[in-house]
Amino acid sequence: MIEVIILAIALSMDAFAVSIGLGATKQQSKVAPLGIIVALYFGLFQGIMPIIGYLGGKGVLSWAESYTPWIAFLLLFLIGVKMIFDSFSEGIEEDISKITHRVLLILAIATSIDAMAAGFSLTLLPVNPLIACLIIASVTFIFSWLGVLVGTKGGTWLENKAEFVGGITLIVMAIKIIITS
């Protein structure tokens, strides 16, 4: 279960980083409702996408069981490397000064693609995938809400650091899968 919590924290770093950026664009009086709305979008998508990855992984598992640790390693490692590279970018490139439901939907999908890929690794963990997805959704909800709050206080300089830490965490998990399999 500790692996699921670590995975949830690592996956939530994308959403946390984007939430900081969203929070930095809003005035103090609008932070509370924005924080809840952002957290709902990001938490929901981060919870749904691993199920999609898990189901895909189960289909692959039947014909490639001996390769699944390597596939999970490769996916987590590549996601981690991507997150580290993304942490050096300038942040959210599109104009989010008008945060609409459409913008939040696009951002929620974009930040949860890695959760879908990571869902594949749930086939290797001795956990109920639905409980794992609920944990991932809950952790992402909390981090997204906190991200909006932090964004209003700390600005955007924390965005990249959160994504970097998430990337390192996924790489460490990938290495652990190879070592223990």
UniProtKB/Swiss-Prot annotation:
Q: Report the subcellular localization.
A: Cell inner membrane
Q: Which domain of life is it from?
A: Bacteria
Q: Is Heme found in the keyword set?
A: no
GO MF, one example: manganese ion transmembrane transporter activity
- Record-annotated membrane-spanning stretches: 4-24, 32-52, 68-88, 103-123, 130-150, 161-181
Tell me how this protein sits in the membrane: Multi-pass membrane protein
Keyword terms? Cell inner membrane, Cell membrane, Ion transport, Manganese, Membrane, Transmembrane, Transmembrane helix, Transport
Q: Which GO terms describe its cellular component?
A: plasma membrane
Q: Which InterPro entries match?
A: Mntp/YtaF, Put_MntP
Chief place where the protein resides? membrane
- Pfam family name, one: Mntp
Keyword Ion transport among record annotations: yes
Q: Give the similarity note.
A: Belongs to the MntP (TC 9.B.29) family.
The record's annotation in PANTHER family points to: MANGANESE EFFLUX PUMP MNTP-RELATED
Instruction: Tell me the function of this protein.
Output: Probably functions as a manganese efflux pump.
Name this protein carries in UniProt: Putative manganese efflux pump MntP
